[in-house]
Amino acid sequence: MQLSIQAVEVLLIMAIKFTQTTLDKVEKIIEESGYVIRYERGNFQSGYCILQAKKVVVLNKFFQTEGKINTLIDLMPQLEINFDALTHDSQKLFDEVMAIGNDKQRQLNLQFVHA
């Protein structure tokens, strides 16, 4: 069964609620892997900056909760997440986020192949 990009995005929205609690859980995954998350003002074209050597993620502080969650989720594949260092709850959420992200990426790849 093939899902459209919109269907995958709807599944993401259904699976993840855009609340402060969810933001806290997503931040916890990143922090448990040794990263520091900072919210700052700045001219971020993409809304974020990663300082890999210092394990610092800087996000635009003017993002709403949904934007912060989406940005952190989009960043996860670029970060060195230590799965074994995560708590059980964080591991479950990380697996869920990565599975949804992989489905979305597959759909994007299929879209380019068929274009």
Where are these regions (language model features)?
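Active-site recognition of the HExxH zinc-binding catalytic motif
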Residues: 70-78
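Metalloprotease/metallohydrolase-associated module, dominated by Zn2+-dependent proteases
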Residues: 15-51, 57-58, 83-115
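Short pre-active-site segment immediately N-terminal to the catalytic Zn-binding motif
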Residues: 58-70
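Acidic, Ala/Val/Gly-enriched low-complexity intrinsically disordered segments
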Residues: 7-10
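Cationic, low-complexity basic patches in intrinsically disordered or flexible, solvent-exposed regions
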Residues: 3
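Anionic group-transfer/hydrolysis microenvironments
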Residues: 42, 62, 76
